[in-house]
């Protein structure tokens, strides 16, 4: 009798990081990247530590604050909860690449990319703003002063672009609800809502509020 061959056993895991890395191909902000990453590396850490795209912020690192929001194939995702190896072959856009995007044809909008009105700023800053290659939402955020410390702004912008791509926001209240996953510690929610509404809905919400809707100083809207 011939002895029964031993059952094939999986190769033992090596301690070296190279043995655990996986090839990943990503297109990030229009540039193709061929990477080898460990299976536990989040998309957030990949972007910040491997590609040096540090505008995407690490806030809570638990998917609760929205600061790490990026666009993957046009959809907003929390990059701190997304493993890099699971996005192999995807198209990723961070805030650094927003200027290269165009708005969906279905989105009704004002010309948020136009220069800021003279009443809002002096002529010199206005000229500088007008020449910057910015996405309409970035222009609207500047026009409405929709940031203070700016830490949450990259995630707010990417989330707002994703909101427009989804095409589900039809009212100001729906914009508020669909942006509620992005927190602003400085409390700039009225300005953020106004900026997103200008581009997504084509209305100047900051000027169209009724007296009842106006925000009382020292409060944060729901």
Functional labels for PLM-detected ranges:
Residues 1-222:
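Signature of N-terminal electron-transfer/Fe-S-associated modules in redox systems
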């Amino acid at each position: 009798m011939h002895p029964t061959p031993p059952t094939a056993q999986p190769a033992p895991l090596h301690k070296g990081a190279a043995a655990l890395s996986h090839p990943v191909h990503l297109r990030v902000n229009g540039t193709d990247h061929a990477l080898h990453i460990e299976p536990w590396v989040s998309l957030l850490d990949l972007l910040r530590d491997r590609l040096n795209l540090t505008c995407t912020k690490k806030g809570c690192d638990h998917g609760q604050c929205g600061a790490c929001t990026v666009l993957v194939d046009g959809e907003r995702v929390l990059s701190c909860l997304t493993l890099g190896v699971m996005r192999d072959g995807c198209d990723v856009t961070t805030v650094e690449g927003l200027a290269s995007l165009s708005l969906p044809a279905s989105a009704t909008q004002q010309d948020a990319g136009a220069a800021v009105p003279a009443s809002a700023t002096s002529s010199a800053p206005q000229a500088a703003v007008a020449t910057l290659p910015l996405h309409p939402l970035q222009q609207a955020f500047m026009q409405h002063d929709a940031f203070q410390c700016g830490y949450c702004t990259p995630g707010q912008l990417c989330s707002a672009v994703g909101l427009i791509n989804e095409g589900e926001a039809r009212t100001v209240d729906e914009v508020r609800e669909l942006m509620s996953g992005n927190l602003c510690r400085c409390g700039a929610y009225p300005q953020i809502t106004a900026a997103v509404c200008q581009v997504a809905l084509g209305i100047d919400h900051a000027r169209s509020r009724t007296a009842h809707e106006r925000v009382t100083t020292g409060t944060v809207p729901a």
